[in-house]
């Protein structure tokens, strides 16, 4: 990679993230930049764990040849090549995160688990329902378009949820994800989440069933408003499928299926 690619803007010399990492949605991480696509909205530990699952950019889906990190000024940085890690890509994060300067992130692990189980839920076309044993616990009202548009904190929660859910649709590239996110955020400022037309308009991009699930899950998410990725994944409020399983129980089931029959079974 040419040096000017890495230093095309003065701000790109920063060792730390300038914007929220698109994987964990936090801004306090160490920046990593991918080659050849150039995307750099990733925390280093996040992208290492992402590549345990796929050697492609989370934004544009292009194959990743090299990762740059540890930036110091305009010309000092570290890098590693994906091909140097051998054929077992599932060892990537274990190899790379041994470095003491990049400690493991529990939040990143939780996000990887969350994406895995969320993809399984969409494949099964399951919608969450409330755990009856927790029905007496506090619930928030689903915000109206006016309430949503006037609350920066609510907008942030909705934006974060939509961003994570759209990552599940592997046929969407980064530009498409960004466009759909902006489109849906604008739509929800003027139209109720539950409105049939909201589903119909989103369905033009990801399909009717998927749109129905996404908006239903967003609605449930806003009713309980978990504080973090971990609290969402570990919540006992959300149950799925005929057995009424939590996301953690589903994750355990997925891992057992893959251990016994191989990863292809997850898609059945």
Swiss-Prot record:
Alphabetically ordered keywords of this record: Metal-binding, Mitochondrion, Nucleus, Zinc, Zinc-finger
One GO term of the biological process aspect: proteasome-mediated ubiquitin-dependent protein catabolic process
One MF term in the entry's GO annotations: zinc ion binding
Gene Ontology CC: one annotated term: nucleus
Pfam family, one: zf-RING_2
InterPro entries xrefs: Znf_RING, Znf_RING/FYVE/PHD
Gene3D superfamilies according to UniProt: Zinc/RING finger domain, C3HC4 (zinc finger) (3.30.40.10)
Zinc finger motifs (RING-type), residue ranges: 21-61
Location relative to the cell: Mitochondrion; Nucleus
Record keyword Zinc-finger present: yes
Major localisation: mitochondrion
Identification of the protein by name: Uncharacterized RING finger protein C16G5.03
